[in-house]
Amino acid sequence: ESVNVVHRWLPRAISGNYGVEKYLLELTRHRPRDIIQLFNELKQQSTGGRLSEQQVLSAEKRYSRDYLLLEMQDEVRGLLSDELSRVAFDAVFSIRKAEFSLEEAYRAGEEFNLKPEDVIQILRQLFDCGTIGMKDLSGVGGHTTFKYRNPGAVFSTRGVQYILHRGIRQAANIASV
């Protein structure tokens, strides 16, 4: 007899309207090691039996803060200069929103003494490593693109809002939209 461990050990939905499978997958970059680490955090929350929604949210917070943010910071460290990699996440997190415009990123960059071209370089590298995605503002429904979902995706500064990966919003103390 096959057993669906997700349905057996986890709540069916999170926040009332998200199916737990989709919710958990959106916290990762669809990499096996991300998924394994998330499930390790879920296992740490277990006290026996089905996990509560609160236990899942606690696991999400630990995964976000103690794993995914550090992984993304390590990736960016190899793509940006030391100076830019030190301020990249602080600048984006200082916007205090899950979705933000290029103009908001420029204003945040000014607070960190970044030139506009530095802000673009940071956003490009954050996009390439999956920290941010782009939401198309020109079409109906606002199609969202993340590089890890579409490896052929190209960074843009036109007609888009940037969206912070759901998996690191807890680490940034930013509410999900």
Which residues does each PLM region occupy?
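Short, Lys/Arg-rich nucleic-acid/phosphate-binding segment
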Residues: 136-143
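Generic signature of intrinsically disordered, low-complexity, basic-rich segments
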Residues: 81-84, 125, 163, 167
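The catalytic "switch" region of P-loop NTPases
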Residues: 1-17
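Short, amphipathic alpha-helical interaction segments positioned at domain boundaries
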Residues: 145-177
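Short amphipathic alpha-helical interaction segments
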Residues: 112-129, 134
